Amino acid sequence: MSTLRMRFLTLSLATAGLAAMAMAPTLSPQAAVVDAPASTLVTVATNPYPADSVLTGYTQRARWTINVLRDNRPALTACNHGNYEPDSGHSSDSYHYSGNAGDCYAGNTPGQYPGPIDKDQLQRAANFLVANAGPLKVQQVIWNGQIWTWPRRSEGWRTYTGGTGPVGGHYDHVHVSIARPGDGR
């Protein structure tokens, strides 16, 4: 590759990086610092978007939270909103239907139990979401046969009874629900 072409590519990448940084949400001086294990302790800005619903894709609020999660947990290989239909096996009030939920994976194959490395990465993602639930507007996290919810946060993780197996029991992915209209957040 020619020196001129390499300089052009370097300049193009630098310009794209600056543009992306300019468009990214910035941490405000009021950003929350959470009390959490060292593996999850970060400064997280408060989600700037209002509770909302959409017909396709993520709401702005959910997209922002998923982006913060993926920025802080780069081992996550995919976070899908699903746009699940009411007959997809989810409960009738699933946050997926309104664009306020995501399912995140760490390299493991959906539908199969993750190996120890992927399981560790998923556990770290779940811990991050719970530790930063206030500013991220997280309403619910389901992972590894357990559930954590904002309204019952003082109880910590509880047994999840909404499904079984790798998918239904949320052993192959971390589910995160973001507060929606009516949740009061």
Q: What positions do the PLM features span?
A:
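Short, low-order "capping/linker" segments at domain edges
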Residues: 151-164
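Secreted/periplasmic proteins that engage bacterial cell-wall peptidoglycan
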Residues: 36-154, 171, 178-183
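Short, exposed beta-strand-loop hairpins at the edges of beta-sheets
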Residues: 163-169, 177
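Generic preference for flexible, low-structure residues
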Residues: 24-29, 145, 154-157
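Secretory targeting and sorting signals
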Residues: 1-31
